[in-house]
Amino acid sequence: MAFVFARPVCSTPAASRLGKWLKIASGLLLFSAYTAITTSCGLPAQSANLSAAGASSKLSSFEFANHGWGGHIRVSVSLPPATVGNAYNAVVSVSGGTTPYQFSVVSGSLPIGLSLNPSAGTISGIPVTAGTYKFTVQVVDAAGLSDEKRFMLSVAAAPVAPAVSVQISPLSPTVSSGTAKQFNATVSNTSDTAVTWSTTAGAISTSGVFSAPDVSVASTATVIARSVADPTKAASTTVTITVSSPVVPPQSTGFDGPAELPRVYVQSAMTDTPAPGNIITVNAGGSLQNALNAANCGDTILLQAGATFAGVFTFPAKSCDDNHWIVVRTSAPDSVLPPEGTRITPCYAGNISLPGRPAFNCSAAQNVMARIAIPSSGVGPLVFASGANHYRLIGLEVTRPVGGIVYSLISLAKGVTADHLVFDRMWLHGTPQDETTKGIQLGGSRYVAVVDSFFTDFHCTSMTGACTDALAIGGGAGDLPMGPYKIVNNFLESSGENILFGGAEATFAPSDIEVRHNHMFKPLIWMKGQPGFVGGPTGDPFIVKNLFELKNAQRVLFEGNIMENSWGGFSQHGYGLVLTPKNQADWNSTGNLCPMCLVTDVTIRYSTISHVAAGLAIANILSSNGGAPRDGQRYSIHDITVDDIDGAKYNGPGIFAMLAMTADVPVLQNVLIDHVTAFPPHTFLGVGNYTSGLQMVNISLNNSISAAGVYPVWSTGGATNCAYYDKPLITFNACFNRYSFAHNAIIGSSSNYPPSLWPPSTFFPPNASAAQFVDYKNGNGGDYHLLPSSPYKNAGTDGKDLGADVDAILVKIADAY
């Protein structure tokens, strides 16, 4: 066969003869001859006779390996796909021919938003519309050779960005009328995670704190969190608002200085808890749980004295009232127990003494208590179910076996409430070396009294983990109203805090707390290096913090308490008493768990603190991960003695009191420290204020006698601290806005701190002898009455003796040892 090849445009033909094999789809063609003809531009056209070789004569497609001219031009066969909204840049690839090339679209059309560069051959731009586009591109080279190719370009739709979403927590909570609840919002798929808050009833702050309205019937409100980045996206939840329980009219109210006293006091006398019903006797081997389940309101359950009841026992909810209590007690008669209002000791469980503890002063040991023990590690043995109420427990030993961790001997089930509970003349204890975190965990309880009881061996050995903070009594955590509480005439022993309110997640502050006539104690045999040292099973010392601490509480009366033994060396520094409202982080420093936490209206009076590394710590500060508390103010501290403050012996700062405040927290204000007797070796007052200008407000330190220490008024550290210069008058003026420092006797102030550096009306006895105490005893267990001849007799602003009212203290702490 023969083909004629006519060049459509003029160019110089190749002189070489065609004679190449051409690849055909079904075989081979062989040029056997060719013919040249002349085109209109005077150049010869060329033809070739092709002979078929192979089995088939069908020619469906072919390409020339060499068409006989000096060059050829070829266009690429495909383009990469495009996406709407994304920049596109592709090159129409050309091979052969002579540059420069010229490109053009000769049929069809490019996607909207794209264009073809006629000289570079690039197709670029930003496509607008998705679809499949067909078009033909022609390429012509400098010699007039051309080729064209039909393309099919796919343009995909733009990917849909994930929509902004909002989640709110907690979902569907229940709150009491007139109370507050913290809500949180999580915004996803945007870098702007801010929300605006709104509610259909009550009020809500910009940080998500919902204040429920006062209601007389149960109602609801809707809380809404709306994305700032995309206001069309929001989340909501329904809040059920219940009617608050009626508040019992205050039995005693008023103020002590700036602090409001408790409005309500728990009544816990036997006559206040009548049980006129039946007697249920449970002997050794019997089922306490069956008895609890079967008891009717007004019944008394007698547990065999001297017997042990092993298990975890749940006190169920029953419809009891103030005239029908359920009493669970030892079967021993009242005549062999200490009288009501008298503290029990381990003597009544057959133990005449315990190592390192004060003497029990019992003539003989007799086991008249019923013993309840958890059989293994965990929580128990006593748990109060949701709604449990009107239970009085008397004459019971509550304990645990050796080995493992026990978290709370007596507790409420998590997240539930219980009310009207009295723990009377009980011995709660761990084992000498095992970790036992709590004696009583108050949880969301109301109207609870712990009276005339004895707590020993609550301790932890871990700096982090499951057991870091041991307490005899703990409360102030949860999302339910808490209080009033009565903690009166107990021996309270714990390595961490003997009593702690707060330190965990909460949306309420426990209120109306009475802490009176207790002995708070840590055995010195727990201090490493002491004779008879006792630590954990591996020899690690127990973690010691302080004797009494408030992180979340309001209206607290702390009166007539004896506090002994606190040392540092762990996360705290051996203070006796600590007031630090805290928006707590958990043990691994995540989360601000208590933005509603506060410490307000605290009265501390007629008490003693002894054998400590430091006396008082009062601070409004951020938590370890930057959370701020709600408030900390209105403290009245008067008529206390703080002796045997020894920083060297007890591993701490050797200071009487510290006042501290950091930036971004409520101002520490309305603090009264009056009529105090103290003997710090290092510093009378440490001040820390890192607020870039804000001052503590209305701070009063009056009518006291204290050792000056080596550095009487001292900075807690830092170049930005207002107390940086460590001079009394300069510090007071820089750190306090409105303060009083009047009629204080500062014993032994050195010449480095002359009277000119102190406020006027300050007295400067050169030594303790000049103060004329009845019996100073080097500031350790002395008689701190002033002699009639003392120059500080009747020298107070109120006409009283300077220092603590020792007679009033002795009356309040009588028989507290």
Segments and roles (model prediction):
Residues 110-128, 136, 204-215:
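Strand-loop-strand motifs at the edges of beta-sheets in extracellular beta-sandwich domains
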Residues 270-274, 297-304, 310-371, 385-394, ...:
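Beta-solenoid repeat scaffold
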Residues 31-72, 157-160, 244-247:
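Bacterial Sec-dependent N-terminal signal peptides
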Residues 325, 389-400, 417-431, 446-461, ...:
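Right-handed parallel beta-helix
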Residues 179, 184, 267-309, 314, ...:
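Acidic Gly/Asp/Thr-rich repetitive segments characteristic of extracellular carbohydrate-active
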Residues 323-326, 367-384, 404-414, 432-443, ...:
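Extracellular beta-strand/beta-solenoid scaffold signature
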Residues 95-99, 108, 188-191, 200-202, ...:
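Short glycine/proline-centered coil/turn motifs in the loop regions
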